Amino acid sequence: MPQHKSAEKRVRQSKRRNARNRVHKAEMKKLVKTVKGLIEKSAEKEEVENAYRAAIQKLDRMAVKGYLHKNNASNKKSKLSKLVNRFSKGDAA
């Protein structure tokens, strides 16, 4: 347990930040899974594109806000783009 007031404050801050990070990362994972699920189900192309756009926006926002490193976000976006492009060409993953 923390022995100093400043250490106690850091514990409180880290708990809040950890909870906030978990919420954002869970939402990001949900959006990515949605895109992958739609591709697996061979859904409408427009539906996949909309889900893809939402996922990309979330990844960009997380990188800007610091919840995710920009290179990590870029890597995830690249992988998603490859999947969506393959799907749109007709070679469903």
UniProtKB/Swiss-Prot annotation:
The keyword Ribosomal protein applies. InterPro entries: Ribosomal_bS20 (IPR002583), Ribosomal_bS20_sf (IPR036510). GO terms for cellular component: cytosol; small ribosomal subunit. The keyword Ribonucleoprotein applies. One of its GO terms (biological process) is translation. Residues 12-23 have a biased composition (Basic residues). Residues 1-11 have a biased composition (Basic and acidic residues). Keywords: Ribonucleoprotein, Ribosomal protein, RNA-binding, rRNA-binding. Residues 1-23 are annotated as: Disordered. Transmembrane segments: none annotated. GO terms for molecular function: small ribosomal subunit rRNA binding; structural constituent of ribosome. Binds directly to 16S ribosomal RNA. Belongs to the bacterial ribosomal protein bS20 family. This is Small ribosomal subunit protein bS20. The lineage of its organism: Bacteria, Pseudomonadati, Chlorobiota, Chlorobiia, Chlorobiales.
